[in-house]
Structure formats: structure tokens, C-alpha cells
């Protein structure tokens, strides 16, 4: 937001200047005069509002948005007949030309050049935009380069003050505010009676990070675990349970043992034993008919699975609310009837389907035997989330292999009028697809027995390797066993998460413990160690950092101090970009670059014992705070010593 002087007379002068600019424009047609009159009325109110806000607000957390609001006023003053033109502000790729750029001049020139404009080209438009830019303490200077690019240099004094305010008020004051109020993030979603494997890792940690970023951005997030807890497979599981444990009340997790082995054994018998297969099919009918004996057995199997899932979620520090397939089952019939009443459902080869333009096959919503399927359940879940949970944004995190399924049922929902045709308008839906996890041989990540890798085994291995690395550094002699164990867990689990999240989610990535546990390069280990080093610098100073926050002053006089400060101030716009594009890798890139900026600063700017010690300790603390917030958003536990 703009930073205007608090002096009332100077604020009134600016308001008058803005109003004068609007009133002293000449127009030649009645239409232009009417448009100008309406614009003058709206802009006069807007100008007063802008000045009032500017007098009371400082840094709101998003540099790009604040600059955009400044240039929005400038655009309205410079080209009042083009009220729909939005400011185009971006961070400068090359810092030597400025910190940010406004790139409106060329596009604006192409709009106005045939309308008898006074301007002679894009550079002139750029100069006019700079001249009309409201005074702001955040802007040190503006200059026009080339074909009208406006380079903006921020005030180092203002930047320092903004960081000081964050140190006092907390980093949550930098959180962006998105236009959406409530979102559903559907992620993880394992199948009952099957162990979570490495494939669930990506959905779980990508979904958790998206949820965390949205929550930080003032969005109410409904974290949904759409577990596979319904379907024909439960017939064979229940029947096998009855055979092994006639007294189902005595069934415990210990008695069943490995649920994955139990599932495979029941599937093996189902495939080979016709009598068992027939019983299993009858069991499905009884389960779906509500038979209490079969419902009880089904609930027992689900409970055992949930216990195993909960252990994984606890280790990953992931929170979810389960609303599986069975939750939506009672609503399916009425949803299908609603679709049918709208003329969307047709008969095809005994099944009931929805034909969709652009797809070779229809979307089946009722099978030929009258049963429901994934599409009917997913459509019902979407209907429920829109109508009962009042979600504005529904995000599904699954592998890219399911893209067509989501495209089809999203299109069916639009055809039904549940969603707008414009996929950028709320309520909206997004499929957040992700690629495969590969082994170092470039093939799908599996064990030697060709089975999928169990997630618990993977986490155990990460923690074990991390602990061994710490012992090799002699930490077992410096720390208590509890400290060693907690740090090994934080580093090991953090390494697994970051190795996934730093990649563009759409790409496949190679799983390598050696790479992810490397303490050099773009790894969680390097970043966690960097944070611990910053904490060590502050501790070694012997200063009370909380007291310095209250009394100390921060300056960004050295080039590396300024570069670090600028990067810190770009945190909010980075989080907003990561949320908007549903890309956690954007935040990972920011975090890694933050550590690189700090390394350059620390290499070139002495902290402890220097004349600038107080200021630089505050900059260290600000860096540590933002790093910790990044770790939190990525679901990684920070370490404070190493």
C-alpha cells in the first residue's frame, strides 16, 4: 500500500492534485463527456479512499500488489478512457535495472495509438505513467528504459522498516490474502486393507503443503481423505475374515498381522476358489444391503487400516479428515437422479452414461448391473462439497494418470450447471497431477521383489541414514539420545519431503537417499543446516534477540544486505504464486534462494563484533523467521543446532 506523509495538508494536496488531473481533461463527444463525468466521480472517491488507506497502512506483505496499486492510480490518471487496463508489475529479472518493472507502456500504446492520443510512442507513455505515479515512501526512484519499461527501485530505508515491523508483529502479517474463502483439498486417499506405498507419498505431502499454504493465506481448508472404503473387494475380505476368524469380535490388528498379506491371500483365494468367489459376491450384496454382521466385519477391517494410516500421518505430521467413498454412498442415487432430470444421462449398452463433447467414450455413472462406480462417487462428492460444504475451490491431488477421469467428470459437472464454464471463475475445480517416483535405474521405484515400496519402510530408512550421518559427525557424544533421535527424524523426514516438493510436480523424479541426504546443494539437509547456523550466529552474539527487536534498528546499506532484505520482502508474493498455480516447487525455489542470499551476506558482511552488529543480527533473525515459516508450509520440522 502507498506510504503517504501523515501531514493532513500534504494528503489534501495530493487529493486535490488527483481530482484536478481528472477535471482538466478535454473531450470532444457527448459519449466521451458522459464517460469522463462518471469516471471523475468514481475516481474522486477512489483517490480519497487511496489517500486515506495510504496514510494508515504500511507494508502489507505483497510488494508486487502494493506497487500494482500505485500504478493503477497512475494508469487511471494517464489514460482515463481505458479503465479496464490492469497494471502489469513483475519482479525484475536483472537487479541492476531495478527491483520491479511496470510493463504496461507497450501494450497500452497498441490500444491508444489509433485514438488520437497525445503520446508519441511507448517511451512517452512510460514517462507519463511515472509522472502520474503517487508519491510513496516505498519507491526510491523510477526510470523508463528501452520501449517504455518502467524500472522501480525500492527505498532501502522503507524496506528496512518493513522488516523491523515484521520482527515485532510476526511473519503472519506478511501472509497473502486470496479471494477464495473456503477450499477442499482432496489428497492421500489410500485404499482400505492396502498399505500406503511410495505412490501415496507424493499425494500426501503435495496435498498437505497446498493445504498449509492456503491456510496461511487466510483460506478455510477442508482437508479430505477420500479413502477407498467401499466396493466389491470388501466381499472377499469379509468372507476371508469369517473363514480365518469365526468370532470376529476377537479380531485385532495383531491377530490379522500384515493387512497387505491378508489382502493378497483373500485375492488369491478369490481368483482360484469358485465357491469362495460366490460367497464373496454374496457378501458384497449383504454389505451393501446393510446386514449388521457384514457391516461390523467391514468396520473392523476399516478400523485396522485407519490405525496403520494414522501412524504414517503422525510421522509425516499430516492432518486429514476422512470422508471416504462410503460417506457419499447414501447421496449417489439422488445426484444421479438430478443429472437424469437435466437430460444428461442416457442409456448405452445397459449402462447409464453421460456423453461429453471432446471425448471418445462416455462417462459411465451407473454400471449395467445397476451398481455405482468411481465416476458416480466422485460426482456425488463434488456435489456434496459444493452444496453442503459450500466450498469455492476443490483441489484433487492424484497422479497424472487420472487426468482424463477428472477432465471428464469436471466437464459433466459444468454440463450440469454446477460449475461455471470459465475454469478461472469460482466455484472452481483443479486436478493437481503429479508424475512417478522412479528408482535410480530410471524405472518405477520398487523393491527387489518387484513389490511397491512401503511408505513406513522408506521413512524408517530415511531416519536411520540421517541418524548415522549425525553419529559420524560426533553428535551422539554432544547430544542426549532424545535430541539425536528428534534431529534424525526431522532431517530424515524433511529430506524425503523436500526431495519431492522441490521438483515440478508434473515431472517424474528419481528417489535417491544419497542425493536427498546430501548436506550440499538444494536439499532439505543443506537448508536445515543453514537455519541452524543462523541460530548459532545469534546465540554466539550473546545478545537478547527479543530485546533487540524492540530497541534495535535495521539498515540495508551493503549491497548484500539489501539483496537479502529484498528477497525476504518477496515472501508473500511467492506464497501467493505457489497457491495460485498449485506449485509447491515455487516455494522451495524461494527457500533455497533465500539461503543463498544469506550465504553471500554472511560471507561479505561481518555480523558479531562489527559496528553494524545489531542491524545484522536483526537481519539474521528475520531470515531465520522466514525460513521457519517456509519449513512449516512445506511440512518440515526445523532444527536449531547441528
Swiss-Prot record:
**Classification via InterPro entries:** aa-tRNA-synth_I_CS, Arg-tRNA-ligase, Arg-tRNA-synth_N, Arg-tRNA-synth_N_sf, ArgRS_core, DALR_anticod-bd, Rossmann-like_a/b/a_fold, tRNAsynth_Ia_anticodon-bd
- Output the NCBIfam families linked to this UniProt entry: argS
Q: Report the EC number(s), separated by commas if there are several.
A: 6.1.1.19
An example Gene Ontology molecular-function term: arginine-tRNA ligase activity
* Organism annotation: Arabidopsis thaliana (Mouse-ear cress)
An annotated GO cellular component = cytosol
- The transit peptide is at 1-53
**What is its subcellular localisation?**
Plastid, Chloroplast; Mitochondrion
Q: Name one GO biological process term.
A: embryo development ending in seed dormancy
Motif 'HIGH' region: list the residue ranges. Answer: 190-201
N-acetylalanine-modified residues are: 54
The UniProt function text for this chain reads: Forms part of a macromolecular complex that catalyzes the attachment of specific amino acids to cognate tRNAs during protein synthesis.
For this chain, the family text in UniProt reads: Belongs to the class-I aminoacyl-tRNA synthetase family.
What SUPFAM superfamilies does the entry give? Answer: Anticodon-binding domain of a subclass of class I aminoacyl-tRNA synthetases, Arginyl-tRNA synthetase (ArgRS), N-terminal 'additional' domain, Nucleotidylyl transferase
Keyword line: Acetylation, Aminoacyl-tRNA synthetase, ATP-binding, Chloroplast, Ligase, Mitochondrion, Nucleotide-binding, Plastid, Protein biosynthesis, Transit peptide
Its primary localisation, in coarse terms, equals: plastid
Reaction(s) this enzyme catalyzes, per UniProt: tRNA(Arg) + L-arginine + ATP = L-arginyl-tRNA(Arg) + AMP + diphosphate
Q: What is the protein name given in its UniProt record?
A: Arginine--tRNA ligase, chloroplastic/mitochondrial
Deletion phenotype, per the entry, is: Embryo defective. Developmental arrest of the embryo at the globular stage.
Q: Gene3D superfamilies attached here?
A: Arginyl tRNA synthetase N-terminal domain, HUPs, Isoleucyl-tRNA Synthetase, Domain 1
Amino acid at each position: 500500500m502507498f506510504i503517504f506523509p501523515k501531514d493532513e495538508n500534504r494528503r489534501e494536496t495530493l487529493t486535490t492534485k488527483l481530482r484536478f488531473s481528472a477535471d482538466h481533461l478535454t473531450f470532444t463527444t457527448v459519449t466521451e463527456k458522459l464517460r469522463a463525468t462518471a469516471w471523475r466521480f468514481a475516481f474522486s472517491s477512489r483517490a480519497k479512499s487511496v489517500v486515506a488507506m495510504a496514510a494508515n497502512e504500511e507494508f502489507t506483505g505483497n510488494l508486487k500488489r502494493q506497487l500494482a496499486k500505485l500504478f493503477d492510480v497512475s494508469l487511471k490518471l494517464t489514460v482515463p478512457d481505458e479503465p479496464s487496463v490492469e497494471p502489469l508489475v513483475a519482479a525484475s529479472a536483472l537487479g541492476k535495472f531495478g527491483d520491479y518493472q511496470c510493463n504496461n507502456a507497450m501494450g497500452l500504446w497498441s490500444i491508444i495509438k489509433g485514438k488520437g492520443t497525445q503520446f508519441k510512442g511507448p517511451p512517452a507513455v512510460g514517462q507519463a505513467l511515472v509522472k502520474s505515479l503517487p508519491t510513496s515512501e516505498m519507491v526510491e526512484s523510477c526510470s523508463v528504459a528501452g520501449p517504455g519499461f518502467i524500472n522501480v527501485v525500492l527505498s532501502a530505508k522503507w524496506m528496512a522498516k518493513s522488516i523491523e515491523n515484521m520482527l515485532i508483529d510476526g511473519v503472519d502479517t506478511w501472509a497473502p490474502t486470496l479471494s477464495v474463502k473456503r477450499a477442499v483439498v482432496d489428497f492421500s486417499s489410500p485404499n482400505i486393507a492396502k498399505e500406503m506405498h511410495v505412490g501415496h507419498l507424493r499425494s500426501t505431502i503435495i496435498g498437505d503443503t497446498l493445504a498449509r499454504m492456503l491456510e496461511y493465506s487466510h483460506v478455510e481448508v477442508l482437508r479430505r481423505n477420500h479413502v477407498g472404503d467401499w466396493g466389491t473387494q470388501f466381499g472377499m475380505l469379509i468372507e476371508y475374515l469369517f473363514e480365518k476368524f469365526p468370532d470376529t469380535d476377537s479380531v485385532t490388528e495383531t491377530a490379522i498381522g500384515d493387512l497387505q498379506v491378508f489382502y493378497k491371500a483373500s485375492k488369491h483365494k478369490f481368483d482360484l476358489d469358485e465357491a469362495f468367489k460366490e460367497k464373496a459376491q454374496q457378501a458384497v450384496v449383504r454389505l451393501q444391503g446393510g446386514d449388521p454382521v457384514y457391516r461390523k466385519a467391514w468396520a473392523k477391517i476399516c478400523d485396522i487400516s485407519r490405525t496403520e494410516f494414522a501412524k504414517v500421518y503422525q510421522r509425516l505430521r499430516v492432518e486429514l479428515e476422512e470422508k471416504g467413498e462410503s460417506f457419499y454412498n447414501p447421496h449417489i442415487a439422488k445426484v444421479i437422479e438430478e443429472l437424469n432430470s437435466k437430460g444428461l444421462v442416457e442409456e448405452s449398452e445397459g449402462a447409464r452414461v453421460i456423453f461429453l463433447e471432446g471425448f471418445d467414450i462416455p462417462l459411465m455413472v451407473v454400471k449395467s448391473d445397476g451398481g455405482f462406480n468411481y465416476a458416480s462417487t466422485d460426482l456425488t462428492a463434488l456435489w456434496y462439497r459444493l452444496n453442503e460444504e459450500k466450498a469455492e475451490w476443490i483441489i484433487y491431488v492424484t497422479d497424472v494418470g487420472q487426468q482424463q477421469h477428472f477432465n471428464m467428470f469436471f466437464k459433466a459437472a459444468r454440463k450440469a450447471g454446477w460449475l461455471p464454464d470459465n475454469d478461472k471463475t469460482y466455484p472452481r475445480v483443479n486436478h493437481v497431477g503429479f508424475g512417478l517416483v522412479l528408482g535410480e535405474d530410471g524405472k518405477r521405484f520398487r523393491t527387489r521383489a518387484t513389490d511397491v515400496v512401503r511408505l513406513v519402510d522408506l521413512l524408517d530408512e530415511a531416519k536411520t541414514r540421517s541418524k548415522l550421518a549425525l553419529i559420524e559427525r560426533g553428535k551422539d557424544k554432544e547430544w542426549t539420545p532424545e535430541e539425536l533421535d528428534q534431529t534424525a527424524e526431522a532431517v530424515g523426514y524433511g529430506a524425503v519431503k523436500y526431495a519431492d516438493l522441490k521438483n515440478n510436480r508434473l515431472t517424474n523424479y528419481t528417489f535417491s537417499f544419497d542425493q536427498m541426504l546430501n548436506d550440499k546443494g538444494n536439499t532439505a539437509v543443506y537448508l536445515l543446516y543453514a537455519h541452524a547456523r543462523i541460530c548459532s550466529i545469534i546465540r554466539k552474539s550473546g545478545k537478547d534477540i527479543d530485546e533487540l527487536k524492540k530497541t534495535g534498528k535495521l539498515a540495508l546499506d551493503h549491497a548484500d544486505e539489501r539483496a537479502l532484505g529484498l528477497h525476504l520482502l518477496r515472501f508473500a508474493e511467492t506464497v501467493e504464486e505457489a497457491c495460485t498455480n498449485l506449485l509447491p516447487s515455487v516455494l522451495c525455489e524461494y527457500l533455497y534462494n533465500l539461503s543463498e542470499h544469506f550465504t553471500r551476506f554472511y560471507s561479505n558482511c561481518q555480523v558479531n563484533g562489527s559496528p553494524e552488529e545489531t542491524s545484522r543480527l536483526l537481519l539474521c533473525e528475520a531470515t531465520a523467521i522466514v525460513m521457519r515459516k517456509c519449513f512449516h508450509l512445506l511440512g518440515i520440522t526445523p532444527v536449531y543446532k547441528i
